From Swiss-Prot:
Residues 1-182 are annotated as: Large ATPase domain (RuvB-L). Keywords: ATP-binding, Cytoplasm, DNA damage, DNA recombination, DNA repair, DNA-binding, Hydrolase, Nucleotide-binding. The gene is ruvB. It comes from Anaplasma marginale (strain St. Maries). This is Holliday junction branch migration complex subunit RuvB. One of its GO terms (molecular function) is ATP hydrolysis activity. Its main location: cytoplasm. Residues 183-254 are annotated as: Small ATPAse domain (RuvB-S).
Length: 331
């Protein structure tokens, strides 16, 4: 795996290994303090009323725990968990087949819900509000609508592109929850918990070194932790991951002190060399990257940490970004 892709948030082949590291209960979940406080109320209230929980929309940058939270909600409600993804639902019949096979109170999780086409969205409207499906049978003058009742259920949608969800769909989610980037202290806890699960010794300095380069994202923190553990097992067989060892391993992986990899640095240097606002299409062409990938995986953290700024005319490097490139001798 190249260092260019090590930080990126798409589901890479090894991501299924992180399932074992996921918390199963809401009390085990680290971070997102306000979200968790509110979720506890919503879950407990629905459980005591023996009703399906209101529909939930989880949104925010990739890798912050949206899928994990969906699993936890189902677990805490003691109901079945069903899942699919927006791109997998190509026609209304696909969604109808899933909805009619749900059991009462089930949780249905739709990842990348912003990628649903409008025809499928319209099927969801009546399903979410009235627990029924309006199916059109026949064509032309002979067409008629059949109303099919479905079990009461909870829909959990997850998206990294909140603005791409249509207003009618967005308004049908009674519980919208925004997930924020993690602090270094929170990521230290995530890493230490993972180390305990897979029986790897790591001290505070080692966990903090990895956490500080994880771009505020648990998925990245766990991936970097696994790679540092690989170096430990290869070079020492046994021992503890300390700050010096973690720093050395991350340097070999091409991750700098701010957590930037080669693709991030290419982005920053290109914007610097443009000497002014530069459009996203121009950046994507220069980096040979998809516009959506840049907007979802590279830019959020750079904007959050004030290294770049979005303006109506394009992206510009901030003073902080310029000083970082200069002090790190990247320019």
């Amino acid at each position: 795996m190249s260092s260019d892709t090590l930080h990126k948030y798409e589901a890479l082949p090894e991501d299924h290994r992180n399932v074992a590291l996921r918390p199963c209960l809401i009390e085990e979940f680290v971070g997102q303090t306000e979200v968790i406080k509110n979720l506890k109320v919503f879950i407990q209230s629905a459980y005591e009323r023996r009703e399906p929980m209101d529909h939930v929309l989880l949104y925010g940058p990739p890798g912050l725990g949206k899928t994990t939270l969906a699993h936890i909600i189902a677990k805490e409600l003691k109901v079945n968990f069903r899942s699919t993804a927006g791109p997998l639902l190509s026609k209304a019949g696909d969604l109808a087949a899933i909805l009619t096979n749900l059991q009462p109170m089930d949780v249905l999780f739709i990842d990348e819900i912003h990628r649903l086409n409008r025809n499928i969205e319209e099927v969801l409207y009546s399903a979410m509000e009235d627990y029924c499906l309006d199916i059109v049978v026949g064509e032309g003058c002979g067409a008629r609508t059949l109303k099919i009742d479905i079990p009461a259920f909870t829909l959990i949608g997850a998206t990294t592109r909140f603005g791409l969800i249509s207003n009618p769909l967005r308004d049908r989610f009674g519980i919208p929850l925004h997930l924020e980037f993690y602090s270094v202290d929170e990521l230290v806890l995530v890493i230490k918990r993972a180390a305990g699960v897979i029986c790897t010794s790591i001290d505070d300095s080692g966990a903090r070194e990895i956490a500080s380069r994880s771009r505020g994202t648990p998925r990245i923190a766990l991936r970097l932790f696994r790679r540092v553990r690989d170096f430990l097992e290869f070079e020492r067989k046994h021992g503890t991951i300390d700050g010096n060892f973690a720093n050395s391993a991350l340097f070999r992986l091409g991750i700098d002190g701010a957590g930037f990899d080669k693709m991030d640095l290419k982005y920053l240097k290109f914007v610097f060399e443009a000497k002014g606002p530069v459009g996203i299409d121009t950046i994507a062409s220069a980096l040979s990257e998809d516009v959506g990938n840049i907007e979802e995986t590279i830019e959020p953290y750079l904007i959050k940490t004030c290294f770049i700024q979005r303006t109506p005319r394009g992206r510009v490097l901030t003073q902080k970004g310029f000083e970082y490139l200069l002090s790190s001798k990247y320019i």
